[in-house]
Amino acid sequence: VYALVFRYLLKFTPGPGDPSGLDVFALWVLCGLLPWLFFANTTTMGMRAIVDNQGLVKNVLFDRETLIFGFVGAQVLTFTLELSLLLGLLLLAGNMFLPWLPILVVVVACLTVFTAGVTLLLAASYVYFRDLQYLWSICTQLGFFAAPIVYPIGLLPDRLQTVVRLNPITAFVTSVRNLVYDLRGPTAFDLTVMVCWSVTSLLIGLGAFSRLSPRFAEEL
């Protein structure tokens, strides 16, 4: 559906992969869509992890963070399976991305840490503010179009490109696509952005969760 709408109706054409030469728009979209779906689905569903397990939270003494990390871990397994299927399709299309797999693992690890941090912050906040799920739904819809997932960033004016690059997910999407579709490494800028956002997200998420968690049982 994305391939039909954005390539044939809206005429978004990223061009062949550089230097891979691969020109399959559906695969190009999937390379950006899968990392985004992992982030969006994990944060959207993960924010309910504390509330949905309130019986456990109120009656059992344990580190509540384990609920979040356990959920994120389960989503990582799903993402790994989906990514493996995509990599299989890319191999069938002739893309020999195998030398880039170690860097792909690093990028996925950074994405996982970033996602875990955001999920921790959302889950802790959701206990106190239940309308957060609706606000976050709007944010993810805006975030989808504020990242080059279904369109090449080169189509945007320079000023708008700068704005899009401020979206944390842009670096992850671009890096995954560069590695397995274009067959080239991520830029130094994207690597720096991914590491900085991952560390910052986790620190903020853990800090907020630690501060808010003592009152979870009372609020629930």
Language-model regions: role of each:
Residues 19-22, 45-59, 80-89, 134-151:
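Hydrophobic alpha-helical transmembrane segments
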Residues 1, 22-38, 102-117, 141-145:
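Small-residue-enriched core segments of transmembrane alpha-helices in multipass membrane transport
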Residues 131, 210-220:
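Short cytosolic juxtamembrane segments of multi-pass membrane proteins
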Residues 3-14, 64, 70-139, 184-207:
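Alpha-helical transmembrane segments and their short interhelical loops
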Residues 142-192:
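Short hydrophobic, aromatic-rich alpha-helical segments embedded in or entering the lipid bilayer
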